[in-house]
Amino acid sequence: FMSSREQILDAIRQSLGRPELSTDAKRALNQQITSHPANLVPARAKGERAQLIKQFQNMAQAAACTVETVSNLVAVPAAVSQFLRANNLPTRITLAPDEWLSGLDWNSNNLLKTKIGSADIADMVSVTPAFAGVAETGTLVASSGSAHPTTLNFVPDYHVVVLRHTQIVGSYEEVWARLRKANKQGRGFTVP
């Protein structure tokens, strides 16, 4: 007896004209899925930390991101406020209910009005922490979960992402390794 899932997959396989996989082929595929073999890592994803940070910044800017470097995390609220003012954007922001992000002194800047939680259609600007940044492509990796509502990544018109230098990795392979490690530590991250 086949489950509904097996019936659907069997119908797809038949429509593609593919024979059923042999036991050895199934075993090899399962081994590959569980062992997480690394793919080819391009040269631009390798290098010293300073090189990777510069590569990330260049690639992110090439993808139309604004990159602002601050001296420490305490300076993040002021940098966000300055960016919003300089670009004539709303100063009402929705923060991810992330422990370290919401622990910053957002009230030190009288121009910002903050809300903590998920985003709704009225929210124009969100501020979230990144899970990682990929130097290879300038990609920001966002996570989702109770402290990182995925609506903050997609609903507001403007998304400010706080990324620490230590979160910048060379390749996607490093992101997947960090994500697997975080999930083993019980943090329950997913990538939207």
Language-model regions: role of each:
Residues 1-192:
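The feature marks the mature, well-folded catalytic cores of soluble enzymes
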